[in-house]
């Protein structure tokens, strides 16, 4: 897995921020029902973000990410991937995600992202919507730029870039991406090599996709974790870049 059970996002809460949150169940166009966690400001949001977790699905780490976004005036919804194979129950620490990830296909994930985007637009009032993913979710965040969702940008932390489980990855589908890309990568990531990252950047450039690929020297996979104190400065910079990307691509 990407993060330990006691991991958390290295983002300090904003004291006094008025944020509402709730567990919700969303339904995709194909009829799939899946769990999600919605958070947002008590005032109209400046934009919306679909938060895409790692391979564990909807976990408290990503609920916290949604809350931190809400404190920034952003409507956020973190989604689970496994409604089709495991129902809408909460994912505990003993959830056998390794049984379900191989059954999770890109088309299904994109259908679920579409439902989350619609929720942010119709229920939360966010006209401009982004995706933000981590690891497994980073990959699907970038792919969502080819999903026909009309998103304003796709952000991914240490996502895989090539083929996986017989399906094309962001490199192979770079020509289909229709939104700016932000990639935040670890220079010491053993799962996603420097060659993988370079190939992704080359593919984006060749396809004419607006992009920024940032590699943090010495940072491991899943560096964005408050337990990883050695990467505190890296994580702070990455979070600043996330917020700056949202600002840069939100009209007005």
Q: Model-predicted segments: where are they?
A:
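N-terminal cap/leader regions of alpha/beta-hydrolase-fold enzymes
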Residues: 1-252
């Amino acid at each position: 897995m990407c993060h330990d059970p006691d991991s958390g996002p290295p983002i300090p809460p904003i004291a006094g921020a008025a944020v509402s949150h709730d567990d919700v169940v969303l339904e995709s166009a194909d009829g799939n029902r899946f769990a999600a966690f919605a958070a947002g400001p008590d005032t109209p949001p400046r934009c919306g973000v679909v938060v895409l977790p790692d391979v564990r699905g909807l976990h408290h780490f990503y609920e916290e990410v949604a809350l931190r976004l809400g404190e920034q005036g952003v409507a956020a919804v973190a989604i689970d991937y496994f409604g089709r194979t495991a129902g809408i129950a909460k994912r505990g620490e003993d959830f056998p995600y390794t049984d379900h990830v191989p059954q999770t296909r890109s088309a299904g994930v994109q259908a679920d992202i579409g439902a989350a985007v619609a929720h942010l637009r119709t229920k939360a009032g966010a006209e401009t919507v982004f995706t933000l993913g981590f690891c497994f979710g980073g990959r699907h965040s970038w792919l969502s730029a080819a999903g026909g969702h009309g998103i304003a940008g796709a952000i991914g932390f240490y996502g895989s870039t090539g083929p996986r489980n017989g399906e094309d990855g962001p490199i192979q589908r770079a020509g289909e991406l229709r939104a700016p890309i932000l990639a935040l990568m670890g220079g010491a990531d053993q799962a996603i090599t420097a060659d993988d990252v370079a190939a992704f950047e080359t593919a984006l450039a060749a396809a004419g996709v607006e992009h920024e690929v940032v590699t943090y020297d010495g940072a491991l996979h899943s560096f964005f974790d408050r337990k990883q104190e050695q990467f505190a400065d890296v994580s702070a910079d990455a979070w600043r870049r996330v917020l700056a990307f949202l600002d840069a691509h939100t009209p007005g």
